A protein has these predicted regions:
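Context-gated lysine
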Residues: 2-5, 24, 61, 88
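Ser/Thr-centric signal marking residues that sit
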Residues: 18, 35, 104-107
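Immediate post-signal peptide segment of exported/extracytoplasmic ligand-binding proteins
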Residues: 20-30, 60-66
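Short beta-strand segments enriched in small/hydrophobic residues
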Residues: 25-44, 102
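Beta-alpha junction/loop-to-helix N-cap segments that form part of ligand/metal-binding clefts
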Residues: 40-47, 55, 59-123
């Protein structure tokens, strides 16, 4: 299931990139609970997401550009931290999509507070 979501997310980004002929690279945020109660599972989740990005970049079919990933730690249990990390990704890193966060309280807060108001794709 995780692989399907990662592949679907990368496919979505590839389709979006084909509509913008000037794009040479796209930045995607990976907002995970690198610390906190899900810390022990995040390595595998992050690895899967990054494998999908690596494969997409290696294919050369992404308008001859690349997908860049920036990471942020949502800490899983504090929506304020997750929102701050997502805002940084949008305002400083200029992400076009955010993968995560993966804890329900953080997910709702980030979607309502950052993703929807800024028109960012949620993966």
């Amino acid at each position: 299931m995780k692989n399907i979501k990662s592949i679907a997310g990368v496919a979505l980004l590839a389709m979006m990139a084909t509509t913008s002929h000037a794009a040479k690279s796209v930045t995607v945020g990976e907002l995970q609970g690198f610390t906190g109660p899900l810390e022990s599972m995040i390595g595998a989740m992050s690895g899967g997401a990054n494998l999908a990005v690596t494969e997409a970049n290696a294919s050369g079919k992404f308008l001859q550009g690349t997908i860049n990933v920036v990471q942020g730690d949502s800490v899983c249990i504090d929506p304020a931290v997750a929102i701050a990390q997502a805002e940084k990704m949008v305002n400083e890193d200029n992400v076009m999509a955010i993968m995560g966060p993966n804890c329900s309280g953080n997910t709702i807060a980030v979607i309502e507070g950052v993703i929807v108001p800024n028109g960012i794709v949620s993966i």
